[in-house]
Design a protein with these regions (language model features):
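A residue-level marker of the well-folded mature domains of exported/periplasmic proteins
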Residues: 12-318
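Sec-dependent N-terminal signal peptides
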Residues: 1-2
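Bacterial Sec-type N-terminal signal peptides, specifically the leucine/valine-rich hydrophobic h-region
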Residues: 6-9
Length: 318
């Protein structure tokens, strides 16, 4: 079992003065988003803000849009959004901009909108490289000839983060694929082919089951050495499919992940997932509170990247 700790950002100061902040989270079905919402709410309230925290059902776009509309109508001074679908909020955010309400995209870049004021996130390319390095080292790719069979999974195609997770991992793994030390028997190596709609555990399980059938993987069939997965909800679907195919802890392929979701931690203890990256979202919440305080006070907002995150309309400061 390997849990990698990954922290970013720090520091916040008082400055709420009772101003109301809206927080829009995508779902309560994953432990990660429950923690993010609770962390932000607690830290905003500690800093003196009133908080309207809403979850969009189970990744329901109309629900999230309606909740944001309500936040705009009820006087939120800043709205923090982790989007269900990064491309679905263009129209509702036009209203926010018309009312001069700043919007902070939280760990998922909101696309195709000029109403996004700031983006708070981790170094997600680095997350991908850590996952790729783990597989490289675990399989001893620099010293063993292989070939090692691997399949690739990333997240939702409407989540800009997969460009960084998948890109980071492939920056490590692709040279070994090109040298045929790693072999992707399915030949599904593009981001589009490896995407998992809504980061769905069920969709990941279905795809993994199909890959097992189509490529003859199994404890008594073709050996599958590893499966790259960008996060834990996808990894859990992969694990479910492999368990269903008869794999045990003695022959389980290496599976990567991130978020250290409770189910994945249990799977790691069972030998059914090899690693997960823990991103300390408390530090990200601290940064969001700090940015919001600076916005409310009319101060310059601290950012450290004004080049990387192009949402199709503008580069969003991060």
């Amino acid at each position: 079992m390997c849990a990698v700790f990954f922290a970013a950002f720090a520091g916040c100061k008082k400055g709420g003065s009772g101003e109301k902040v809206g927080i829009s989270m995508p779902t309560q079905s994953l432990q990660r988003w429950n923690q993010d919402g609770a962390n932000m709410k607690a830290q905003f309230e500690k800093a003196g803000f009133a908080v309207d925290l809403q979850y969009a059902g189970d990744n329901d776009i109309p629900t999230q849009v309606a909740q944001i509309e309500n936040m705009i109508a009820t006087g939120c001074k800043v709205i923090v959004i982790a989007a269900v679908d990064g491309s679905s909020l263009t129209e509702v955010l036009k209203t926010a901009k018309q009312k001069n309400i700043p919007v902070i995209a939280y760990d998922r870049l909101i696309m195709n909108s000029d109403a996004v004021s700031y983006y708070a996130t981790f170094d997600n390319f680095k997350v991908g490289t850590i996952q790729g390095e783990f597989l490289k080292n675990a399989l001893k790719l620099d010293s063993e000839k292989g070939p090692f069979n691997v399949e690739l999974f990333t997240g939702s195609p409407d989540d800009n983060n997969i460009n960084f997770f998948f890109g980071g991992a492939m920056s490590i793994l692709k040279p070994y694929i090109d040298k045929k030390v790693l072999v992707v028997k399915s030949k599904q190596t593009s981001k589009a082919q490896c995407a998992t709609q809504n980061w769905s555990t069920e969709e990941a399980q279905k795809r993994m089951e199909n890959l097992i059938t189509q490529n003859g993987y199994g404890p008594k069939g073709t050996k599958l050495h590893a499966v790259y997965s960008s996060n834990d909800s996808v990894a859990q679907g992969i694990t479910n499919a492999l368990v269903g195919a008869g794999y045990t802890k003695d022959n389980f392929p290496l599976i990567t992940g991130q978020d250290c979701d409770k189910t994945s931690v249990i799977n790691m203890l069972k030998g059914q997932q090899a690693m997960s990256i823990f991103k300390d979202t408390r530090t990200l919440a601290e940064q969001v509170v700090k940015m919001t305080s600076q916005i409310i006070k009319g101060e310059q907002v601290d950012v450290n990247d004004t080049k990387t995150y192009n949402n199709g309309v503008m580069v969003v400061p991060s």
